């Protein structure tokens, strides 16, 4: 809308200030420019629709033969658990990495019971950033044909909180888990992929990395970092035949999002992971972001609108995002007060 108003004003000025012959030329130039701009937006939207609803992604078997392995971080719950189950169903052996050993054991048993694949587990707290943990992970994957890496481990704020009030340990954990944990794991896995000239490195991003998110500033910044890092990595590894993809996601029902009810815009992990794995290599709703995708249909449409129509870094979008998270914070604080009152009675 802002473009059209500027376009109209510019056209009016040309009409006022130029000779009649030049007015015609000027109007034609502006009309052509405007038409090309609108046509490019329409074509981009058509590409988005084709990517989301028609065109298939790369087959998972293109990343590794039967008997190859997938490493999944944050594997014990939510998206990580679902990635593990669906990759096992596709015939991959699974290395499960997460913090809680008992949950990993239960999931490993579920996978081997349902599917004829092998599993390995590692109970690892990414917040600790312990060299010994990474050495143990290296020992586990050494000699394995790791075809797929799912960087799913992540942490957000307990509730939306102004940066000045964010607890230091929460801030440190978010950066250590989301950024450093992802980098160290990836750097450990990709040499084998580079040797074999194939592989998939898939990292879970967030709309928080696309849109500055007040009251989730540290989390938003960590996901923006992953966006830039993953896109750069995609360019570096493409000559080795490795597909790198950052998945831009809106809300999904999970412990992290604290959303329990599904809707058109909030899928459950099963539906979301199915969309991700069926659209590898397709941009979905993120045509302007190389080596990135927003593959779930409603998330893709939102991502297209926010990045191709709106100005994601503009004050309007940031202000709306701030208002939304201020309201969420107020509700969370009221709920905490009610629960505190119940405990004291």
UniProtKB/Swiss-Prot annotation:
EC category name: oxidoreductase
Pathway note: Lipid metabolism; fatty acid biosynthesis
Cross-referenced CDD domains: 17beta-HSD1_like_SDR_c
PROSITE patterns noted in UniProt: ADH_SHORT
This protein's record includes keyword Transmembrane helix: yes
Catalytic residues identified in the record: 219, 223
Cited SUPFAM superfamilies: NAD(P)-binding Rossmann-fold domains
GO biological processes: fatty acid elongation; secondary metabolite biosynthetic process; sphingolipid biosynthetic process; very long-chain fatty acid biosynthetic process
GO MF terms, alphabetically ordered: ketoreductase activity; very-long-chain 3-oxoacyl-CoA reductase activity
Cysteine disulfide partners in this protein: none
Coiled coil regions in record: none
Residues involved in NADP(+) binding: 71, 125, 133, 152, 219, 223, 252, 254
Keyword terms: Endoplasmic reticulum, Fatty acid biosynthesis, Fatty acid metabolism, Lipid biosynthesis, Lipid metabolism, Membrane, NADP, Oxidoreductase, Transmembrane, Transmembrane helix
Compartments reported by the entry: Endoplasmic reticulum membrane
EC nos: 1.1.1.330
Catalytic reaction equation(s): a very-long-chain (3R)-3-hydroxyacyl-CoA + NADP(+) = a very-long-chain 3-oxoacyl-CoA + NADPH + H(+)
Similarity-based family: Belongs to the short-chain dehydrogenases/reductases (SDR) family.
Name listed for the protein in its UniProt record: Very-long-chain 3-oxoacyl-CoA reductase
